[in-house]
Amino acid sequence: MSMSSAHPPSMAGAFPANATTHADGILLTAISSERTHLRANSGPHTSAAGAVPVDVYVDFHSGPCQRFEAAVGSTLDEMFGAGDITLAYHPVAVLDALSTTRYSSRAAASSGCASDGGRFREYVRALFAHQPPEYSAGLTNDELVEIGAKVGLTDSAFAECVRTEHYEEWTTWVTVRAGDRGVNWWPTVHVAAEPVRANAEAIRAAVSGAASAEADQAW
């Protein structure tokens, strides 16, 4: 499917819940407390105003992205839970050639369905935990529905959204927008709109630097 980078999908229901300003990603609003380093009784947590923006570009069929999630995901969740950052994920689909069923596109589209169901971050973790081998058929849509059920996405609307690939066009838009921004490697991490190395130490340092710069400007 081709799409002009100047024109996002215009059909009704084209964007998932909590889409970013340009509808090219998902902005987290909360993460279940049992999956972060927050106190067990703290409940869902949202980022504070003035937090440093962090953008993460991933393909759900990318081995490096899976390793990034395993190594850095908890750090991102911790900083988000503390209110230090806002966190946006941009699920691109550039590795469809690594499966026989367009798995990258289908997985990315299904993450939009998870955002509608209020369990986006939990579903992202589960997708990476169940990542199929490269050059395989990938997971079926029914298997994606089953993964969603494991993180609390049991509503029939989620299942229908995944099985009909409702957010296929949105996935294309996210991928086009990433290319327009010069993103050509996955994972890619931007802190305050600047690219940084995709490891916990570099991200923490960049967030600290951006927060200090903002504080200096406030004076």
Place the predicted regions along the sequence by residue.
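Extracytoplasmic/secreted cell-surface and envelope-processing proteins
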Residues: 65, 97-98, 137, 197-199
